[in-house]
Amino acid sequence: MDWTSYHDYDEINAWLDSLATDYPELASVEDVGLSYEGRTMKLLKLGKGGADKPIIFIDGGIHAREWIAPSTVTYIVNEFVSNSATYDDILSNVNFYVMPTINPDGYAYTFTDDRLWRKTRSETGSVLGCKGADPNRNWSFHWDEVGASDSPCSDIYAGPEPFSEVEMRNVRDQILEYAANIKVYLTFHSYSQLWMYPWGFTSDLPDDWQDLDTLATNAVDALTAVHGTRYEIGSSTNTIYAAAGGSDDWAKGEGGVKYAYTIELRDTGNYGFLLPENQIIPTGEETFEGVKVVANFVKDTYS
């Protein structure tokens, strides 16, 4: 797979499988459930230190139209895999559990029908035929309290109940299974160039917000050093808007992951969701440096 163009869901899954085949000492892939429309969801396990090592859990593509997110997640994986000798210290002491595209049906739909589709593709029972829920309003922690809609036709429809969307249940179950070892949760979105931490349901900050802010600042400093790309740092509510039911709030509030971040990638609105393909590699390059800071922090702190 290359990073000069965007790739569809099947291509990404095939690439994940190829990593397990080509780098068996480094990568393994597990099928962890099906999407609403029956697409296989895969979890990549990357590392060579054994199952007891601290984990960084990474996902992308929760919103279908945010194509740069899966591209960046796969770029990061490829960078570690292709240069595993260089990053031996990280890969021997930290495990990366990665799901690049956690809204498979929505993502597929953006390739075939509606480039700007955001939600899942589940049936809602809407008399208007509106489909899907916003998967990043569907998590159970303070679900539907703020910044979400009860209308199935809304782009921010929270769903009929928490975890109504099978894709989010699949991701949740993986986080819960490995929660004891997950030290960092990174979920990649676009756009706006933000590195955010909880909470999304309130303007109040977590008790340990300074720890989260410090790590985010160090990561963003490394990111910015690559191409000069500026990121804003802060809690979700205070940086963009209040929205409950997000995966990062859940990871921290229910999953017990101390360092939970939502990262909004390039750009700041010039192209928005339609980020040109010639920005995939530079976005990957700079984001990798930020993730590397996080990985070294986990290695030094927990391994």
Curated annotation (Swiss-Prot):
Cofactor requirement: Zn(2+)
EC numbers on record: 3.4.17.2
Intracellular or extracellular location(s): Secreted
Pfam families (UniProt xref): Peptidase_M14
InterPro entries listed in its UniProt record: Peptidase_M14
Reactions accelerated catalytically: Preferential release of a C-terminal lysine or arginine amino acid
Keyword Chaperone recorded: no
Family: Belongs to the peptidase M14 family.
Cofactor note: Binds 1 zinc ion per subunit.
PANTHER family: FI01817P-RELATED (PTHR11705:SF91), PROTEASE FAMILY M14 CARBOXYPEPTIDASE A,B (PTHR11705)
Protein name, as recorded: Carboxypeptidase B
Active site: 264
Species this protein is from: Astacus astacus
Keyword Metal-binding assigned: yes
